A protein has these predicted regions:
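Acidic donor-binding segment of Leloir-type glycosyltransferases
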Residues: 192-234
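Conserved donor NDP-sugar-binding/catalytic core segment of glycosyltransferases
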Residues: 265, 269-317, 381, 387
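N-terminal signal-anchor transmembrane helix specifying type II single-pass membrane topology
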Residues: 1-59
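Short aromatic/hydrophobic "clamp" motif used to bind/position activated sugar donors
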Residues: 257
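Cell-envelope/extracellular polymer assembly enzymes that use nucleotide-activated donors
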Residues: 168-173, 202, 370
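A recurrent flexible, glycine/aromatic-enriched loop bordering the glycosyltransferase active site
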Residues: 242, 316-345
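Lectin-like carbohydrate-binding module/patch detector with strong preference for beta-trefoil
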Residues: 470-620
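Glycine-rich, basic loop-to-helix element that forms the pyrophosphate-binding segment
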Residues: 236-252
Length: 620
């Protein structure tokens, strides 16, 4: 009897081990089987999986639920809500969704916690196929859960911040054209997962005439199965980003319109900081901090810790430093002259009082200036909310073909300038003379709107709102410090940025003047902003590490010094980087460009500009 019992126990134990091993092997297998083959040679992602490969669709709530103080051990840094925490009153509340935060704190898997994800070997061909049509690593996105967790990178004070108890409802409008399946659905999923219960009235996916089959019936079927407050509206012809936003906004029923791009991820408690300023004054427009989702690995990181939006006189978006009062209150909204683009919240009532977007603007470009100028000049206020953070994929390249309607961006800029910029438009035309000859279309309705709303002058905007812009981006620019080719004394080679883009490295190459027939980008400028950039482009030499041999990257010029501040020494011929106290160096054999400890005896650190403004450098 005893022997039979032992045999039985042994059999049961063996069976349990077999079941457990089979389960683990199955999970490992399915986590990498993210794509189903569809006839026609394409791959359709399956329904999303979380780190445990068993994720329920995001919950939908019909009314706000009471705040909870339940937290995971991972959230010890978050202050426990209490009736007297942070000077709270009966009129405010803690809007954090602690159960969701607790769930995310323990999530593990590809891309979880916003970590970089690297594809397994053998998928290069499939990766490149998707890269070409998306401008980012869409295959990596397919391996990452739609419900993926993100790091809470807000200022610590945001975790204790309370907001008014009664907040308006929001309609989130997401325009898209041929967006990749998983990035589009992750956008919607992140909004629902990280928004307090009951505040999201609806998510409207505004389809700008996509032609991908999976964005038609498969998308509608998926939404019908997994969501109740997400729906798609479709254009019957290609309208462009601006009119697609308007199409979605016209379907909205929430108190507040929130516009997001179709490859974004809302972060922890992102919504209350956007809604509270509008609840207090419906003519306040609120923008979140925009974080970076890496286009290659989907790693999530901060772009910076705040700056005020602005522009130069070619209407490139620029940034102004925070004011001292803003720096002293790092969790409070601060005024900003210009929004960065398409991520913002605005009262639905106020949006239509302002006439929405100008429907005469084609495709994209200029709409952020048109709306920003209109808000400020017509009695509104615009702020950035540091405690609201949304990640955004900045594509490696634009995958969509030119619509074939000429210089639509220039036309849009002229349209904005003629309606809103008054005499200041001449500064734009001085830099872009051909804009004068572009047909802006009929401006009658827009000029009548400005008159009806009794809007202020652009001079008022420049003096009262963007008052410090002339010191950073003057209408009449001072002379640059140095320009032309930059030749290394040791190697005789020139710095060649090779038309590289943001977050890319560059190197040395034979000087174009020495070898005719070669192509490259060797005309550089040490500008009056004290940055170094390719002539006629707005990407700058950027160093983010003080390590020896640190790389030099190209990054969008921000005019705020820091990583992009450079000084040229006409005696030592050094290109000195003050924030790291290192000098530009190179390897003559590998042609690599990097940073090193400054040494006047090292010839690889000596750089010869083709033209030098000695007077300007003497007054640097």
């Amino acid at each position: 009897m005893r022997r039979n019992t032992k045999k039985l126990l042994k059999l049961v134990t063996t069976a349990l081990l077999v079941v457990l091993c089979t389960s683990l092997l199955f999970r490992t297998f399915v986590s990498y089987q993210m794509l189903d083959y569809v006839p026609g040679g394409s791959f359709l992602p399956r329904a999303p999986r979380d780190a445990a490969n068993d994720v329920a669709a995001p919950r939908v709530f019909s009314k706000p639920a009471a705040a909870t103080g339940d937290k995971a051990s991972e959230l010890k840094a978050v202050a426990k809500p209490s009736s007297d925490a942070g000077g709270s009153t009966e009129k405010d509340r803690d809007w954090h969704n602690y159960p969701q935060m607790q769930k995310e704190a323990s999530a593990k898997g590809p891309g979880e916690q916003g970590l970089a994800f690297f594809l397994p070997a053998g998928l290069e061909q499939k990766k490149e196929q998707l890269y070409k049509v998306n401008g980012f690593n869409a295959l990596a996105s397919d391996f990452i859960s739609l419900n993926r967790s993100l790091p809470d990178i807000r200022h610590p004070g945001c975790r204790k911040k309370r907001y008014v108890k009664e907040l308006p409802t929001a309609s989130v409008v997401v325009p898209f054209h041929n967006e990749h399946w998983t990035t589009l659905l992750r956008t919607a999923t992140s909004v629902l997962n990280r928004s307090p219960p009951g505040l999201i009235k609806e998510i409207i996916l505004a389809d700008d005439f996509s032609n991908k089959d999976q964005l038609k019936k498969p998308l509608e079927d998926y939404i019908a199965k997994h969501f109740t407050n997400v729906h798609v509206v479709r254009a019957t012809k290609r309208e462009g980003l601006i009119r697609a936003r308007l199409m979605g906004a016209r379907q909205a029923t929430g108190d507040v319109l929130i516009f997001l791009d179709s490859h974004t991820e809302a972060n922890t408690n992102w919504l209350p900081p956007l809604l509270e300023p509008i609840a207090k004054d419906y003519r306040t427009v609120v923008c979140p901090f925009i974080d970076v989702i890496d286009y290659e690995t989907f790693a999530y990181r901060a772009q910076d810790e705040g700056a005020r939006g602005s522009f130069d006189w070619e209407l490139y978006y620029k940034r102004l430093p925070l004011l001292p009062d803003d720096l002293a209150k790092p969790t409070e909204p601060f005024k900003s002259p210009v929004m960065a683009g398409g991520l913002f919240a605005i009262s639905r009532k106020y949006f239509w009082e302002l006439g929405g977007y100008d429907e005469g603007l084609d495709v994209w470009g200029g709409e952020q200036y048109e709306l920003s100028f209109k808000i400020w000049q017509c009695g509104g206020t615009m702020v950035d909310a540091p405690c609201s953070r949304v990640g955004h994929i900045y594509r490696k390249f634009a995958p969509f073909p030119n619509p074939g309607i000429g210089d639509f961006v220039g036309r849009n800029y002229r349209r904005v300038a003629e309606v809103w910029m008054d005499e200041y438009k001449e500064h734009l035309y001085h830099r872009r003379p051909h804009y004068r000859h572009l047909d802006p279309g009929d401006l009658t309705a827009q000029k009548a709107l400005r008159k009806r709303l009794n809007c202020k002058s652009f001079k008022w905007f420049m003096e009262q709102v963007a008052f410090d812009q002339p010191s950073k981006y003057p209408a009449v620019e001072p002379p640059d410090y140095a320009w032309g080719e930059v030749r290394n004394e040791e190697s005789g080679l020139c710095i060649d940025t090779q038309f590289k883009g943001q977050n890319e490295r560059f190197s040395l190459a034979p000087c174009l003047k020495d070898q005719r027939g070669r192509s490259g980008e060797q005309q550089l400028v040490l500008t009056w902003h004290k940055d170094v950039r390719p002539a006629k482009r707005s990407v700058c030499f950027d160093v983010s590490s003080s390590d020896v041999h640190a790389p030099v990257m190209l990054w969008s010029c921000h005019g705020m010094h820091g990583n992009q501040l450079w000084k040229y020494d006409t005696v030592t011929k050094h290109l000195f980087h003050p924030i790291t106290a290192n000098c530009l160096d190179c390897d003559a054999k590998s042609h690599e460009v990097f940073m090193s400890i400054c040494d006047s005896d090292v010839r690889t650190q000596r750089w010869l500009f083709e033209h030098v403004n000695e007077t300007a450098l003497a007054n640097w």
